[in-house]
C-alpha cells in the first residue's frame, strides 16, 4: 500500500461522517428554500419555491386531518373537558367569579346595580307579590299558623303596664273627653224629645215613694234646668265636671280598667272565636285589598335608596362572604351532574362551533415558511439530536466500509 495516498483512505469516512451529520439540515433547507418562486425570462425556475412553501395549503389540510383524526378525537376532547371541568376547578372558578362580583360592587357602588336591584324589589313587591297573595289568600289555611302564633304570643299576652295605663287614661280625660266635651255631650243628649221620654218613662215605671216623687215633681224641669245651666254657665259647668272627675277618681278607675284589660280574662270560647275572626279578617283583607295596599306601599317607597343600603349591607356582611363557598360548591355539583349526563352531546356540538380543524389550517397557512423552517430546525436540534448524530455515525461507517473495499481492491 502506498502511504503517500493516505488521504484516499481517510477521506471517505471523514466525508461520509460530515455529509451524514449535516444531511438533515441540508434536507430541511431544501424543503423550504427558496421561500419564493424565482423567475428567469418570465418562466419559473423548477423546484422554486421549496416543496413546503409551494404546497403549504395542502400541508395545512393534511396536518389538520392528522391532528383531528389521531390526536384531538371527540373522545380525547371529552377527556380533556372532564379534566378541565373537575368539580374542584369548577368550584374555584365559580367562587372566583362570585368574589369578583362582590368586589366589583364594593369598588364601584354604581347606580346601575342599584337601579337593577331597585327594579327587582319594585317588581317583586308591587307586581309579583300582590298576585301571589291574591291567589294564596283564597285558601282557608292561608297564614293560619302564622296568625295564630301572632295572636297567641302577642295579642293574647298583651297587657298595658302601669305607666302606659296612666298615660292612656290621662289622654282620654284630657284629649278625648275633656270637661268641655262632656258638657257639650250632655247638651246634645238632653234634647226636648229625650227629656220627654226620660220623664214619661220615670213616671210610668216607678212605684212607691219614687212614684209619688215622679208624678209630683217629675224630671222634666230638672233636666231642662241642667241643660240650661250647661248652656249658660259653660265655665262653671266645666269646673264642676272637673271636680266630679277628681272626686269620683275617674282617672284612677280608668287606669285600673285599662291595666286589667287583657284577652286572657275572656272565656276560652270567646278567645278561640276572636282568634278565628282575626284570622278570617286578615285573610279577607289580603284577598280584597292586599294588592292595593302593596301597590300603594310600593309607590311610596324609595327603592333606589333601599337598594343602595342593601348592596352596602351585603358587601360588608360576613354571612355573604362565608356563604360564597357553599354556593360555589353547590353550583359546581349541579354543573358536574349536568356535564356527566350531557358531556358527549356538548362536546359534539362544540366541535363544529370551535372549528379546531379550520383554526389549525389557518394557523399553518398564515405562518411564514421561514418560521416553519425555524420551528422544525428547533425540534430537530432539541428533540432529534440523536438522529443527527446517528446520521454522522452512519456516514462515517459507510465511508469506512468504502475505505476497506478500496484497500482490499489493492490486493
From Swiss-Prot:
- Which Pfam family name is an example for this entry? DUF445
Q: Which residues form a coiled coil?
A: none
Q: Which GO terms describe its cellular component?
A: plasma membrane
- Indicate the principal place this protein occupies in or around the cell: membrane
Tell me the membrane topology, using the record's own terms: Multi-pass membrane protein
What InterPro entries does the entry give? Answer: DUF445, UCP032178
Q: Where in the cell is it found?
A: Cell inner membrane
Membrane-crossing residue ranges in chain numbering: 3-23, 387-407
Q: Which UniProt keywords apply?
A: Cell inner membrane, Cell membrane, Membrane, Transmembrane, Transmembrane helix
State the family named in the UniProt similarity comment for this chain: Belongs to the UPF0754 family.
In its UniProt entry, what is this protein called?
UPF0754 membrane protein Npun_R4433
Q: Which organism is it from?
A: Nostoc punctiforme (strain ATCC 29133 / PCC 73102)
Amino acid at each position: 500500500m502506498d502511504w503517500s495516498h493516505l488521504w484516499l483512505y481517510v477521506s471517505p469516512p471523514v466525508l461520509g461522517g460530515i455529509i451524514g451529520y449535516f444531511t438533515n439540515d441540508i434536507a430541511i433547507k431544501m424543503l423550504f428554500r427558496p421561500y419564493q418562486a424565482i423567475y428567469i425570462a418570465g418562466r419559473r425556475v423548477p423546484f422554486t419555491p421549496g416543496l413546503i412553501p409551494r404546497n403549504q395549503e395542502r400541508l395545512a389540510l393534511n396536518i389538520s386531518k392528522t391532528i383531528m383524526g389521531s390526536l384531538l378525537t371527540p373522545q380525547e376532547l371529552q377527556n380533556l373537558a372532564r379534566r378541565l371541568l373537575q368539580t374542584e376547578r369548577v368550584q374555584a372558578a365559580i367562587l372566583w367569579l362570585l368574589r369578583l362580583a362582590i368586589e366589583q360592587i364594593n369598588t364601584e357602588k354604581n347606580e346601575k346595580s342599584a337601579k337593577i336591584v331597585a327594579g327587582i324589589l319594585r317588581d317583586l313587591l308591587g307586581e309579583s307579590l300582590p298576585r301571589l297573595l291574591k291567589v294564596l289568600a283564597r285558601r282557608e289555611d292561608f297564614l293560619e299558623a302564622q296568625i295564630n302564633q301572632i295572636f297567641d304570643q302577642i295579642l293574647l299576652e298583651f297587657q298595658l303596664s302601669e305607666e302606659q295605663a296612666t298615660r292612656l287614661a290621662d289622654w282620654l280625660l284630657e284629649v278625648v273627653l275633656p270637661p268641655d266635651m262632656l258638657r257639650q255631650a250632655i247638651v246634645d243628649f238632653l234634647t226636648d224629645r229625650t227629656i220627654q221620654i226620660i220623664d214619661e218613662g220615670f213616671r210610668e215605671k216607678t212605684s212607691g215613694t219614687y212614684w209619688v216623687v215622679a208624678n209630683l215633681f217629675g224630671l222634666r224641669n230638672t233636666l231642662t234646668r241642667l241643660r240650661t245651666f250647661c248652656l249658660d254657665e259653660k265655665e262653671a259647668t266645666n269646673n264642676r265636671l272637673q271636680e266630679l272627675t277628681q272626686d269620683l277618681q275617674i282617672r284612677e278607675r280608668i287606669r285600673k280598667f285599662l291595666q286589667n284589660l287583657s284577652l286572657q280574662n275572656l272565656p276560652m270560647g270567646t278567645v278561640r272565636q276572636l282568634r278565628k275572626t282575626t284570622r278570617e279578617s286578615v285573610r279577607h283583607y289580603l284577598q280584597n285589598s292586599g294588592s292595593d295596599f302593596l301597590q300603594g306601599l310600593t309607590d311610596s317607597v324609595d327603592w333606589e335608596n333601599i337598594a343602595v343600603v342593601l348592596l352596602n349591607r351585603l358587601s360588608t356582611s360576613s354571612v355573604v362572604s362565608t356563604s360564597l363557598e357553599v354556593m360555589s360548591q353547590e353550583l359546581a355539583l349541579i354543573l358536574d351532574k349536568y356535564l356527566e349526563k350531557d358531556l358527549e352531546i356538548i362536546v359534539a356540538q362544540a366541535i363544529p362551533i370551535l372549528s379546531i380543524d379550520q383554526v389549525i389550517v389557518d394557523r399553518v397557512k398564515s405562518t411564514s415558511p421561514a418560521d416553519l423552517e425555524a420551528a422544525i430546525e428547533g425540534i430537530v436540534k432539541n428533540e432529534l439530536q440523536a438522529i443527527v448524530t446517528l446520521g454522522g455515525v452512519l456516514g462515517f461507517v459507510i465511508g469506512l466500509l468504502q475505505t476497506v473495499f478500496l484497500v482490499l481492491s489493492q490486493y
